[in-house]
Regions:
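A gly/proline- and charged-residue-enriched helix-loop-helix capping module
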Residues: 2-24
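A short acidic, glycine/proline-enriched capping/turn motif at secondary-structure boundaries
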Residues: 3-5, 27-28, 43-46
Length: 191
């Protein structure tokens, strides 16, 4: 993303042929927007739709046992920033200052480890569900299905796992207690 004005960012930069599954804007963050706005300056030649979903219906479709486990534990997001894979830490944190990255991590409860001068591992446990500020309903609100390795095309996931192992993946998600999220749970969430 690029910042085009103070707190105004472009959408995720992604291939025009690609598909980004439905998700909650910045739910992996400690501070997410109350509102999002959409604008298209240059429409794509084909497709280009932005689907929206009623989160009450989405939450209701997820079985109670799954909701309760995520509600109890939250989601642990693991990111590995580096020049050879995904984003660099400078791109991800939009700064060249390691001190600023560390201050941000301390402020947001994110654990971090500098693996070397160019690579950073960050782990954060966040909520899996939130209480809606107006209705009071507890709703599904996370990126577990997006960050998890199973969201990658299978051939890419296998290649990355062979190359860097599970702990070196650019991103992955676990239950907040660090245990793996089962494939069938993710299949249910994505259904």
């Amino acid at each position: 993303r690029q910042e085009v004005a103070h707190r105004v960012f472009t959408s995720t930069e992604f291939s025009p042929d690609g598909w980004i599954p439905p998700h909650h804007e910045m739910s992996y963050s400690h501070n997410w927007p109350s509102y999002i706005h959409f604008y298209c300056q240059t429409p794509p030649a084909t497709q280009g739709r932005t689907p929206l979903a009623d989160e009450r219906r989405v939450s209701a479709r997820i079985p109670e046992a799954i909701r309760q486990r995520f509600l109890r534990h939250g989601v642990c997001y693991v990111r590995n920033y580096g020049p050879e894979i995904d984003l660099t830490w400078q791109e991800g944190f939009q700064t060249d200052s390691r001190a600023e990255v560390e201050a941000y991590c301390r402020q947001t409860g994110t654990q971090w480890t500098w693996l070397d001068d160019q690579r950073l591992n960050a782990r954060q446990v966040r909520q899996a569900m939130v209480r809606h500020p107006l209705s009071g309903e507890t709703l599904w609100f996370n990126h577990a299905h997006m960050f998890h390795v199973s969201n990658m095309p299978p051939a890419l996931a296998r290649a990355l796992l062979d190359e860097v192992g599970e702990q070196g993946l650019p991103r992955n998600a676990y239950y907040g207690d660090g245990s793996p999220i089962e494939a069938e749970v993710l299949d249910t969430i994505r259904a």
